[in-house]
């Protein structure tokens, strides 16, 4: 279940099929940055949508362009920051929480995985202040999601908390509107 792509390498990246991604990349390095005809996603964006670290790492080693945008004008960083727990993740966390806190450790592991993904993209030179079709940066999305793990990473990479989206809101405005006082304080210190 999920998204169906017209480009086989995009579908393989979305489904975490490293073998298929490797085969397509081996055939021609052009496939590493191919854009799907339906929504413009690249294999890197597809892998970031699902948080597939091995695929992202492989594509980055093959020099995938981290700054390519899809039809919504989003980069892989937008999707990495927007990545949430899946329904299955929540189900496992809830079921395993009473069992020796396994659910808690699963939650921490997934959060660390997402942090690692964002770090990889930042280290690869992704434009941290890139805006999508609505004027949102990755920092806007991190603030909306109250992601206190990723916000310091983005700020350290020089994300600008004062960039306004098409609704006239900056990341700081979003944090204040949603009453996320700790995040608002972080953003004020950075600006």
UniProtKB/Swiss-Prot annotation:
- Which SUPFAM superfamilies does the entry mention? Ankyrin repeat
Keyword terms, alphabetized: ANK repeat, Repeat
Question: ANK repeats: which residues?
Answer: 39-68, 72-100, 101-130, 134-163
Q: Which SMART domains match?
A: ANK
> Which Pfam families does the UniProt entry name for this protein?
Ank_2
Instruction: State the InterPro entries in the record.
Output: Ankyrin_rpt, Ankyrin_rpt-contain_sf, ANR22
Gene3D superfamilies given for it?
Answer: Ankyrin repeat-containing domain (1.25.40.20)
Q: Does the keyword Ligase apply?
A: no
Do the record's keywords include Repeat?
Answer: yes
What is this protein's name? Ankyrin repeat domain-containing protein 22
- Native species of this protein? Mus musculus (Mouse)
Instruction: Name the gene for this chain.
Output: Ankrd22
């Amino acid at each position: 279940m999920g998204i169906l792509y017209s480009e086989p390498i995009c579908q393989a990246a979305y489904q975490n099929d490293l073998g298929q991604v490797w085969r397509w990349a081996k055939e021609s390095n052009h496939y590493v940055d191919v854009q799907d005809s339906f929504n413009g996603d690249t294999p890197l964006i597809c892998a970031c949508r699902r948080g597939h670290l091995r695929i992202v790492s492989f594509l980055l080693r093959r020099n995938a362009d981290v700054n390519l945008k899809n039809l919504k004008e989003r980069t892989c960083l937008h999707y990495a920051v927007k990545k949430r727990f899946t329904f299955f993740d929540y189900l496992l966390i809830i079921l395993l929480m009473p069992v020796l806190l396994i659910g808690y450790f699963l939650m921490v592991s997934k959060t660390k995985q997402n942090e690692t993904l964002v770090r990889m993209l930042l280290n690869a030179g992704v434009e941290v202040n890139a805006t999508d079709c609505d004027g949102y940066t990755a920092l806007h999305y991190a603030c909306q999601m109250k992601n206190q793990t990723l916000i310091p990473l983005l700020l350290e990479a020089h994300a600008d908390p004062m960039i306004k989206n098409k609704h006239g809101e900056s990341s700081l405005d979003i944090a204040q509107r949603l009453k996320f006082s700790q995040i608002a304080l972080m953003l004020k210190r950075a600006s």
